[in-house]
Amino acid sequence: SNVNQNTITKINRLNLFHLEHLGYASTMIAFYILPLLIFFKKNISFHMKNFFTNKLNYLFITLSVVYLFFVINNLDFQYYTGEKHSRYNYGLGITHKVSILFFENLLLREFFTYISFFISWVIICFYIEKKIMDILIFTFFFIISLFLFPIMQEYFDLVITLTAILLLQNQFEINYKRAFIFYGYFATYLIGCIMYYL
């Protein structure tokens, strides 16, 4: 059979939930919504104030810290991402690739990865604020990540960007300067990808 044995396709395989994918999914989602923050009509300080006054964010951040403790104590990072005997010969998104490029030491890679998980959750919370529809949609992507193997950046490429724009288009103010920064962000990403795979 050509079906990936690690992908959950039947009810009796639910014990194979890939909980570690929640962190990697968050980095992929955050990567695509980060440049959209520059398009907000209101300044960043306004949204920062909303972020810190929203009690729901503290719940999400607390859950993310609990998740980090769970992953740190249960994930064999070397087996999962190490160059030798790894479950992943590809995938895991930009955070994994950047960690490989900048850190030879596996412990530093692991530290960088977990910090990236946490920062990504903060970015996502900052973006969605109190919007229930946004929360539900992004929750859908997190749930999907539990079933997929391998989890790859391509799964989130255009879908996340278009979804985020459609959800908050009324709160965006687009001009040439902001558009230039936006395209520069993804152009840098494209160049980096080309260099990585050369």
Please state what every model-predicted region is.
Residues 37-50, 121-132, 167-184, 198:
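Membrane-interface junctions at the ends of membrane-embedded or membrane-associated helices
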